[in-house]
């Protein structure tokens, strides 16, 4: 059939809006999209949208797959429910930051790459949505590892170089300044370590030499493969060997656990070093338009290099044969073949997908999950004398980093973030609304066990509790609130698929990204790097290490 020609029997119309893209065709029936692909097939057997049927001369889809219109079904002489198979150099599970970054890196080297995402949107936990006429960011308090334009070293410079972005593609604004607030004492810090040093000199004068010694003992990023024997040491023990004041130890470790620790109570020293550099030595930044500009740039680059992104395409199984992965099966039955698989789904979650694993060790899953209470204000936070970018607070001298077992949430400690309090360019101006975001620890199982009516009521109750806790450490903003939203561990579970809604994944990281299968690898939180920059660097590093060998 020629473009635009109607099928003489069934009224089928073929359109070709983009003939330059491999002569890819869209096919419609009764003005409903049926599928797309390259024109092919025979008089008696053809396929479109991944569905094979006989008696029609149609086209074979090679990219996006759509369900066949119900209006079309009566006209088909027969349908075989088995989906057609496509083959890729690398299949990536998850369109979060790490998956997208890995896809870009591989597509640069002309690999045929397909990213599969279960949901209707990209980003995983670091995403965004629109509600009530307002845009909301999810996950992005700040991008850690801030670096100024032209910097040659560090994770941010690495990702810009390896993904071939420019500094203007992210255009990060620096934080105004953040604080660690415990009862009776406060430490301010910004993107210059000298401020934190001066704060420690002022509040803990006997500890300043110990703090400097701690800085000198940090593992370098080049040591983050886990081979250094100090990597798995207790962070509390190592820090306490340099700093003898227990309160200062608790204060320094608080932000680092909040922004990147999957282990309860303590932290691997290697992970402590990663987060210490990310938060204290490099600092925080944010694009004016938030996480959406980061995701937009990643997707645009990936697709521009020929990568395939399939949304609403969850993976139900990883096929194995003789100890090697051969491909995946999607939730709708589509089979895709791949030479290798890179998964950001999590270590336990990935093992569960493999058809050669009967029961992964679910006890190793992470337990730490959060709720986040978002308040939209009728004024800027600076209007009521709140200029902090982020406040990490704790209401006692001991920092408790553990899932609350007997309640929905633990509001004794939390994080207050205002995206308004960054140094944006004058041409960008101020954000349209004042926003305060408050994060507290939560129990995934208790939230998920609530019936719908009690779940909605609990969101209101816990919003009130988290705000009431936070205003002990910042000016009271409750009379300025004009809109709210709350996301819970149930939300996190839905959009990340992590067991227990674990924000930072499993406590035991697989730093080399390997699994029990020689061609299935991990990237993202369970590989070891967390946060936006960490996730992107994880995707790049695992792609370089495992997927470009011999390329």
Language-model regions, residue ranges each:
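Mid-domain catalytic core of redox enzymes
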Residues: 31, 316-430
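A glycine-rich dinucleotide-binding beta-alpha-beta segment and adjacent secondary-structure elements
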Residues: 249-259, 415-416, 472-529
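Rossmann-like flavin
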Residues: 182-267
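N-terminal glycine-rich phosphate/pyrophosphate-binding loop and immediately adjacent elements
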Residues: 83-209
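Helical element adjacent to the flavin cofactor pocket in flavoenzyme catalytic cores
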Residues: 275-325
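C-terminal segments that line or cap access tunnels to active or ligand-binding sites in enzymes
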Residues: 379-487
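A conserved FAD-binding loop/helix module that cradles the flavin
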Residues: 525-546
